[in-house]
Amino acid sequence: MNIKSLLLGSAAALVAASGAQAADAIVAPEPEAVEYVRVCDAYGAGYFYIPGTETCLRISGYVRYDVKGGDDVYTGSDRKGWDKGARFALMFNTNSETELGTLGTYTQLRFNYTSNNSRHDGQYGDFSDDRDVADGGVSTGTDLQFAYITLGGFKVGIDESEFHTFTGYLGDVINDDVVADGSYRTGKIAYTFTGGNGFPAVIALEQGGEDVDNDYTIDGYMPHVVGGLKYAGGWGSIAGVVAYDSVIEEWATKVRGDVNITDRFSVWLQGAYSSAATPNQNYGQWGGDWAVWGGAKFIATEKATFNLQAAHDDWGKTAVTANVAYELVPGFTVTPEVSYTKFGGEWKDTVAEDNAWGGIVRFQRSF
């Protein structure tokens, strides 16, 4: 064997080995394209598509801190010091389109803290411990305030009663229900019809709610029933609701009108009547047969809004509240509020003092 043959044989072997190794090599697949979060603007600001779906999600919430002093305008008692409360609320909205309309959900979790010098503040909801803070103390709790599903005009889950939501709330004040107009949170099945003529209507079957002292939930299979009709236009709106309390077998009704005087100034007035002249019921919780509420809202500047509410019921309770909501920077609002309650008539013997003056300052960061 000569040198030339040896070199040619070695080269051929080397080429064959290289080809075999190339045939056995693992080829890495091409990387998949990264699917970044997409903005969903079909349902308003803050929504984005859940990756891999056509469902839009929005996460929002607020952090709030309240400081209260003076009298308790709900009971007439002297606080004898500062009452404080904090809340972190976290909200989730989802929406997607189906052949039956928009399919949506809404949930709200509340994490509450209350440190009272003198009394329990029911405004901060359910507490996880058993300590009674009526005479002072600290309490904390977590509350699932809302959890419902919507499909078109259909709604089912935990929400606030249509007795409130359909007509509207009692003004943009903190102490809005000193003259109460019914319990709020309830399990319900509701349907709202919205025609093209500006006349939405609602029908709801409700479980009933509860507060610190009373339980208004149904005691059998028969639900509470709420029905309502509304007309809305550029000038404002007028709405009415009728509710049947299946526990006490009585009914209550409210009629409300809102008028936009200008694009910065609006007023509203609401009257109510109950066939059962007692606050111990699910809907007509004012004193006596009737009650009336009224209020105004004035947008003074881009940062400051003035709110006023006044109310009176058949038993002689009169309540007035005013505040200024001032937005220091976008998303952060400070609201000082002053309230007065006169306990007259049949209310006089149920409270510590006939006249109560109270104040509150709320700090809230919304996101």
Curated annotation (Swiss-Prot):
Subcellular location: Cell outer membrane
UniProt KW Disulfide bond keyword: no
GO terms, biological process: monoatomic ion transport
Cellular component, GO annotation: cell outer membrane; pore complex
GO molecular function (one): porin activity
UniProt entry tagged with the keyword Ion transport: yes
Domain of life the protein comes from: Bacteria
Residues annotated as signal peptide: 1-22
Membrane topology: Multi-pass membrane protein
Keywords: Cell outer membrane, Ion transport, Membrane, Porin, Signal, Transmembrane, Transmembrane beta strand, Transport
Complex and partners: Monomer.
Record text about domains: Consists of 16-stranded beta-barrel sheets, with large surface-exposed loops, that form a transmembrane pore at the center of each barrel. The pore is partially ocluded by a peptide loop that folds into the pore lumen.
Family affiliation: Belongs to the alphaproteobacteria porin family.
Role, per record: Forms passive diffusion pores that allow small molecular weight hydrophilic materials across the outer membrane.
Other remarks on this protein: The pore formed by Omp2a is larger than the one formed by Omp2b. Omp2b pores have optimal permeability to allow growth and protection against harmful compounds. The larger pore formed by Omp2a may be advantageous for intracellular growth, when the bacterium is competing with the host cell for nutrients whose concentration is particularly low within the phagosome.
Protein name: Porin Omp2a
Protein encoded by which gene: omp2a
